[in-house]
A protein has these predicted regions:
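Short, charged low-complexity linear segments at domain edges
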Residues: 129-151, 371-379, 418-437
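Long, charge-rich, low-complexity alpha-helical segments
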Residues: 59-151
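A sequence-level detector of short linear motifs
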Residues: 57-58, 242, 408
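Short cysteine clusters
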Residues: 160, 167, 171-174, 391-394, ...
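Acidic, low-complexity/disordered tracts enriched in E/D and polar residues
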Residues: 1-80
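Radical SAM enzyme [4Fe-4S]-AdoMet core and its adjacent flexible, acidic
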Residues: 2-4, 10, 33-36, 255, ...
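Flexible mid-to-C-terminal extensions adjoining Fe-S/redox cofactors in radical SAM and related proteins
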Residues: 6, 11, 405-462
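Conserved alpha-helical substructure of the radical SAM core
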Residues: 102, 113-116, 120, 124-252, ...
Length: 462
């Protein structure tokens, strides 16, 4: 179905690029909204609202126009505290804008829609039931309308520098170790700043700073500060998260930090990280929490750290409420025999997760399992997970290698995996290249498998 002339005109003037607004930026209920246009607007093709870089919601054309009108009305108040009277004026302006596009709709109805939309957004980001039904976003069906992924992982730190190992630990399961594109020469500060602007121009709303170990770069705070338009996350081993660095990252508007914590047992953690850094990691988590950053932990699960419930209990005691866990990504260090020997069977992995999920529910924690294909959908749902992981390569996420090479995902670092260079190649050519389209088409099947290969032991194992 086609749009009206008024709708088409408004969308052309106000929604031809990604729009962004942050509500209550200094408060506990901060809400960051990115409104993403589709390639070609149609009445039956939704726009997309990305909330805090996590919740992906389809919006009708009318609600997208209403939200864009609100964003326009909020622009003069960017970075300022908004009084109740000012907010009433902002809402009235948004309603007036939408009413000009939809003159046959009563302003009271538009005002009610605006309130329902914002109330639903806040409920979803708080993990609550929204007052109106929200249709889940089917990325597989929506893939052909996308012009860019929703997240780009920037591998700002290389695994090697000047011919030597360039990480402060050597994790047994490191996906970037022994991979050609994980060890290329790093871009300098100005080049990474240019990459960040390229991502914004492409309409990518979320950036993750990762590596290698991104905290080994002296310019990390500057890069994060330059990315304030995006929802930003830092993936780190946490060892260099001093109090001062955490405060600087918070001041630079970093949205969240994910720290790899292998185990509550110091000896096991150090064995898996290949360095005696347990105390540093715990200190880093505490510093990040104290600085007010949104902190989560990530734990790749194997036969050596099966007491995952104890790891969650430790995280809980440190003030962390969010956790992700996974099997072993079958690439890099996880393809070596020592790592393969620790892979868990589906039965063993299920036995690890069941008590962990019970602990999380009892202690108001949230866990996401992120490895496609490791466990059947029915098992994950029975365990209590609300989402079944699926491959997002060239669909929901992509990555930029240390030298600017664009990759299907941050683990896809093997030779000849590059899809172009973000500094030298136009984005539309990278996104629409045959190799990128092939990977995206596989991801869009939503078959809950990892395109990098088999991850689960065929038989036997632990």
């Amino acid at each position: 179905m086609f749009l009206s002339r008024a709708e088409s005109s408004y969308l052309h003037q106000h929604l031809s690029v990604v729009r962004h607004v942050t509500l209550d930026p200094e408060g506990p209920g901060v809400l960051r909204i990115h409104l993403l246009p589709c390639k070609k607007a149609r009445r039956n093709v939704p726009f997309v609202a990305l909330l805090n870089g996590q919740d992906i919601l389809p919006l009708s054309v009318s609600w997208a126009i209403l939200l864009a009108g609100l964003m326009d009305a909020l622009q003069p108040f960017e970075g300022k505290e908004i009084t109740e009277d000012q907010w009433a004026g902002i809402a009235a302006q948004a309603v007036e804008t939408a009413a000009a596009v939809y003159p046959k709709t009563a302003p009271d109805q538009i005002r009610a829609d605006l309130n329902a939309m914002l109330t639903s957004f806040r409920a979803l980001t708080a993990g609550q039931e929204p007052p109106v039904h929200v249709q889940p976003m089917d990325l597989g069906a929506y893939a052909r309308y996308m012009a860019a992924p929703h997240r780009m992982d920037l591998m700002v730190s290389s695994m090697e520098k000047d011919g030597a190992w360039h990480c402060n630990q050597k994790c047994l399961h490191c996906y970037a170790a022994n991979q050609p594109l994980g060890a290329v020469k790093e871009l300098d500060t100005d080049q990474w700043l240019a990459v960040i602007q390229k991502c914004r121009a492409a309409g990518i709303p979320q950036l993750t700073f990762t590596g290698g170990e991104p905290t080994m770069r002296n310019d990390l705070v500057s890069l994060v500060h330059a990315a304030q338009w995006f929802v930003t996350r830092l993936n780190t081993n946490g060892r260099m998260l001093t109090s001062a660095l955490c405060r600087e990252l918070a001041d630079a508007s970093l949205d969240s930090v994910q720290v790899t914590l292998y185990s509550a047992d110091e000896a096991i953690h150090n064995t898996l990280m290949g360095a005696p850094g347990y105390a540093d990691t715990i200190s880093g988590i505490l510093n990040a929490v104290e600085a007010g950053l949104n902190v989560s932990i990530n734990t790749p699960l194997c036969s050596l750290n099966q007491d995952y419930t104890a790891t969650l209990a430790l995280a809980n005691s440190l003030g962390v409420r969010y956790a992700t866990c996974s099997g072993l990504i079958p690439t890099g260090g996880a393809e070596t025999d020592p790592s393969k020997a620790t892979r868990l069977t589906p039965e063993a992995l299920t036995a690890v997760l069941r008590p962990a999920m019970a602990y999380a529910e009892q202690n108001h924690m949230e866990i996401n399992f992120t490895s496609p294909g490791w466990l059947p959908d029915a098992v994950l749902l029975d365990l209590g997970f609300t989402q079944v992981p699926s491959c997002g390569a060239c669909l929901s996420n992509m990555a930029v290698a240390p030298d600017g090479t664009v990759l299907p995902c941050q683990s896809w670092l093997r030779e000849n995996a590059g899809l172009g260079n973000i500094l030298h190649d136009p984005w539309h050519k990278i996104w629409n290249a045959p190799a990128c389209r092939r990977v995206r088409e596989e991801s869009a099947k939503m078959e809950h498998i990892c395109q990098l290969g088999t991850t689960v032991p065929a038989q036997g194992g632990l």
